[in-house]
Amino acid sequence: GPNCIGLMNTWHHSVFSQPIPNLNLKGVDLISSSGATAVFILESAVTKGLQFNSVWSVGNAKQIGVEDVLQFMDENFDPEKDSHLKLLYIESIQNPDRLLFHASSLIRKGCKIAAIKAGSSESGSRAASSHTGAIASSDSAVEALFRKAGIVRCFSREELTTVGCVFTLPELKGKNFAIITHAGGPGVMLTDALSKGGLNVPKLEGEIAEELKARLFPGAAVGNPIDILATGTPEHLRLCIDYCEEKLDS
């Protein structure tokens, strides 16, 4: 601190605000420069069912900053007991080398880290400075640092908590994706996003596609994305999921 809400973990609570998330040893660790933003992120996470192992709010970081908490987690990391998932909200990177070293070290130990770096624009830097006394850092420098460390960069609390939820899932095998939707537009956008991420959305055609199409409403598309139409039923959705799981290669 100052300008923080304290910390909480499965052994100790020093937070006097809500919401208080479900604490779980296998949940995520959240480190936030801002106390109010920690609560803001918690509100988003709770609605998604995302659980936390610990929450650290460092405020103005006059004594302990984000880098210090990461160093503590790295140097005391127990792969059997500690969370492998870290979410960060950062306004000031006071020691980029330390952040890089300990984030990279944790990732090599099997952790996954996602972070928001606020105040990377000129106006944002001014706002962050007035909020927590943050030192400005250019957007390109932040991008390079995160890429080198292996940190997934996020730009909103919804993106951060969604990535946190993805981190909790088992690792995916293969690069092929089937998209099932009841509206064409989202399917197109998701196809673009997956393709830009180096993943495949292979075209479905031939006997497999015709067999599936015959079991959906007229007008449904099965080329991948699979569009069951707005009038599609829950049974159609179940059918498509089972079909993709059983008959398509990953």
Predicted feature descriptions by range:
Residues 1-250:
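Catalytic-core regions of core metabolic enzymes
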